[in-house]
C-alpha cells in the first residue's frame, strides 16, 4: 500500500463509524464518491471479495464485515495486513524509525477546527448510550480544548488486581475495626470527586515520613481546585482506626508531597491546590502522634496524559505503567464482542488475535527468532497490550520498532471496531 493510500485509509478510519448513523434500512447516504473509491481500493488491496455497502444498500457494510472478520480470523490469509510494507514510503521505505508516525500521521492537537466540527456530532463516534449533541459554537471551543481535560470520576478508573482488592469492595474492611494485635494497614480508595488514602492503626504512630503507594490506575490523574483534609468517611461509612481531631498548636498536623511537586501541601488547610498523582507514591509527613489517619484530596480530576501525540505514538505509555484503556477503544469494540458472545465465537477469535499479534511482532524481528511474549490482558484491552509490547524482554526488537508495531496493531484494532459492529454469523 502506498503512502498516500495509507494516509487516506487513516483518515477514513477516523470517521468511518459515521456511516452507520447516516443510513436507514431503506436508504444509505453516508458515503461520498471519494469515500467509496478509497474504501473500494482498500478492500481490493486486502482481497476482501464482497463489498457490502456497494451491492446492498439495505445492509451497509455487513457483507464486508463478515468478510473482514473471517479475513482477520484466518491464519493463512491475514499475513498481508501484517507486512511491514503497510508503512512503506513511495520513495524510500523505512520502518526502523517512527519518522513516518511523526511526519505523516496527523497528531490530535494539529487537527483543524473543521475536522472537529465534522466529527463532534457523529453519534457513532460517541460510545455513550445517549449521545450528546454539541452546538457548532461549542465545537469550535472543543477544537481548542486541552486534550484529556474532560473531568473524570476517579471511581471509574479504579481496578482490582492479583494483589490489590477493588475500590468499593474495600468499604466493608475499612468500616470494620482492626482486631487486637493487628498490624498497621495502608489503603487508598476513591469516591466520585476525591481520593482517600492513609494508614489504619491500633496504636499511636510516631511523627515521621510515610509513603503511600499509588496504584497505576490512579497515577494518570491530575486534580485541580483541590482541598486536602483529614476524614474518617468512605462511601457513607466510618473508616475505623483513624484519627481526625489531632492538633499541633498553630502548626500543621501533617503535610503531603507528590513526586511531581516539591512543595508540601498542608492537610486541613483552606488552600486550593492542583497536583498530579503520577510518580507512584504520595509522601505523608506527620508532626504529632496519630492513631491512624485518612487524608482526602477532593477536587476536579482529569487524565494527566495531555501530550496529544501519544494518541498515535503512545509515548505516554513509556512514561508510566498505566493499565487504563486510555484510548476508549473498548467501548467501540463492545458491539462486536456482544456478537461474538452470541455466536459462541469469543474464544476462537481471541486465539486468532493472539496469533495475529505474535505474527505481527515476528514481522519486525530478525528471521527465525521466537516471539516469547505472554499477554495477560484480553485482546480488546489495547493499552495494556501496548504496554506489554513496549516492555517485554527482547533485545533484538528496538524501541522504535515496538512503537511501529503498536501503531500497526492500533489500525487493525480500529478496523475491527468499525467493521465488527456489522458482523453476522453466516
Curated annotation (Swiss-Prot):
General function of this protein: Capsid protein which self-assembles to form the outer icosahedral capsid with a T=13 symmetry, about 70 nm in diameter and consisting of 260 P8 trimers. Mediates the secretion of assembled virus-like particles from host insect cells.
Protein name: Outer capsid protein P8
Biological processes per GO annotation: fusion of virus membrane with host plasma membrane
Key words of the record: Capsid protein, Host cytoplasm, Outer capsid protein, Virion
Family of the protein in this entry: Belongs to the phytoreovirus outer capsid protein P8 family.
Origin species: Rice gall dwarf virus
Quaternary structure annotation from Swiss-Prot or TrEMBL: Homotrimer. Homomultimer.
InterPro entries recorded: Capsid_hemagglutn, Phytoreo_P8, Virus_capsid_a-hlx_vir
Domain of life: Viruses
Gene3D superfamilies linked: 2.60.120.170
Predominant localisation class: virion
Localization annotation: Virion; Host cytoplasm
Cellular component terms (Gene Ontology): host cell cytoplasm; viral envelope; viral outer capsid
A molecular-function term among this protein's GO annotations: host cell surface receptor binding
Amino acid at each position: 500500500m502506498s503512502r498516500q493510500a495509507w494516509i487516506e485509509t487513516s483518515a477514513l478510519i477516523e470517521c468511518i463509524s459515521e456511516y452507520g448513523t447516516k443510513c436507514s434500512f431503506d436508504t444509505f447516504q453516508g458515503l461520498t464518491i471519494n469515500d467509496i473509491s478509497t474504501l473500494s481500493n482498500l478492500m481490493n488491496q486486502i482481497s476482501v471479495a464482497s463489498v457490502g455497502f456497494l451491492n446492498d444498500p439495505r445492509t451497509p457494510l455487513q457483507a464486508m464485515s463478515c468478510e473482514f472478520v473471517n479475513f482477520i480470523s484466518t491464519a493463512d490469509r491475514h499475513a498481508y495486513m501484517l507486512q511491514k510494507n503497510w508503512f512503506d514510503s513511495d520513495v524510500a521505505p523505512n520502518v526502523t524509525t517512527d519518522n513516518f508516525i511523526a511526519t505523516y500521521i496527523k497528531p490530535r492537537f494539529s487537527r483543524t477546527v473543521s475536522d472537529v466540527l465534522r466529527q463532534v456530532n457523529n453519534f457513532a463516534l460517541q460510545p455513550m448510550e445517549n449521545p450528546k449533541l454539541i452546538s457548532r459554537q461549542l465545537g469550535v471551543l472543543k477544537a481548542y480544548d486541552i486534550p484529556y481535560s474532560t473531568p473524570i470520576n476517579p471511581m471509574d478508573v479504579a481496578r482490582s488486581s492479583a494483589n490489590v482488592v477493588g475500590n468499593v469492595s474495600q468499604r466493608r474492611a475499612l468500616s470494620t475495626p482492626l482486631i487486637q494485635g493487628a498490624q498497621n494497614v495502608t489503603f487508598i480508595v476513591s469516591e466520585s470527586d476525591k481520593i482517600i488514602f492513609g494508614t489504619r492503626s491500633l496504636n499511636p504512630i510516631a511523627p515521621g515520613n510515610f509513603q503511600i503507594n499509588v496504584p497505576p490506575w490512579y497515577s494518570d490523574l491530575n486534580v485541580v481546585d483541590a482541598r486536602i483534609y483529614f476524614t474518617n468517611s468512605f462511601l457513607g461509612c466510618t473508616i475505623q482506626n483513624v484519627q481526625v481531631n489531632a492538633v499541633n498548636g498553630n502548626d500543621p498536623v501533617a503535610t503531603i508531597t507528590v513526586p511531581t511537586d516539591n512543595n508540601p501541601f498542608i492537610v486541613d488547610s483552606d488552600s486550593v491546590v492542583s497536583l498530579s498523582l503520577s510518580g507512584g507514591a504520595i509522601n505523608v509527613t506527620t508532626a504529632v502522634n496519630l492513631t491512624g489517619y485518612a487524608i482526602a484530596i477532593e477536587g476536579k480530576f482529569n487524565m494527566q496524559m495531555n501530550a496529544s501525540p501519544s494518541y498515535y505514538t503512545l509515548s505516554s505509555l513509556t512514561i508510566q505503567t498505566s493499565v487504563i484503556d486510555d484510548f476508549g477503544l473498548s467501548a467501540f469494540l463492545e458491539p462486536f464482542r456482544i456478537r461474538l458472545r452470541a455466536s459462541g465465537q469469543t474464544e476462537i477469535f481471541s486465539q486468532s488475535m493472539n496469533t495475529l499479534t505474535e505474527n505481527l511482532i515476528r514481522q519486525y524481528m530478525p528471521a527465525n527468532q521466537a516471539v516469547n511474549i505472554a499477554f495477560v490482558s484480553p485482546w480488546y484491552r489495547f493499552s495494556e497490550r501496548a504496554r506489554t509490547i513496549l516492555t517485554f524482554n527482547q533485545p533484538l526488537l528496538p524501541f522504535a520498532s515496538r512503537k511501529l508495531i503498536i501503531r500497526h496493531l492500533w489500525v487493525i484494532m480500529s478496523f475491527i471496531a468499525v467493521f465488527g459492529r456489522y458482523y453476522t454469523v453466516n
